[in-house]
Amino acid sequence: MPTKKNNFEEQLNSLEKIVTNLENGNVPLEDALKEFQEGVKISRELDKKLTSAEEIVAKLIDSDGTEHKLDPNNAAAPED
C-alpha cells in the first residue's frame, strides 16, 4: 500500500496495477472496492503532486517566457 513517502513513479505504478486488476475483472467484489478506494486515494495524491509541479514551473517561467533560477533551499519559490 503506497504511503506519502513513495515517490511519484512508485505511486503511478501502483495505480496502474490497480487499474489493470480492476479491468481484468478477476477480483472479488469486496477486494475490487478496496482497490478502487486505494486507487482513488493514490490518484488524488498524484494530482496534488502534479499541481505542485505545475505551480513550480509556472513560477520559474513568467508569462513572457522569462526563465528564473530555482532556489535550491526553497523549491517552491524562484530566485529573482
Curated annotation (Swiss-Prot):
GO biological process, one term: DNA catabolic process
Entry-linked Pfam families: Exonuc_VII_S
Reactions it catalyzes: Exonucleolytic cleavage in either 5'- to 3'- or 3'- to 5'-direction to yield nucleoside 5'-phosphates
EC assignment: 3.1.11.6
Keyword annotations of the record: Cytoplasm, Exonuclease, Hydrolase, Nuclease
Cellular location(s): Cytoplasm
Enzyme's top EC category: hydrolase
Disulfide bonds, paired cysteine numbers: none
NCBIfam families reported in the protein's UniProt record: PRK00977.1-2 (NF002138), xseB (TIGR01280)
The family this protein is said to belong to: Belongs to the XseB family.
Function: Bidirectionally degrades single-stranded DNA into large acid-insoluble oligonucleotides, which are then degraded further into small acid-soluble oligonucleotides.
Protein name (database record): Exodeoxyribonuclease 7 small subunit
Gene name tied to this protein: xseB
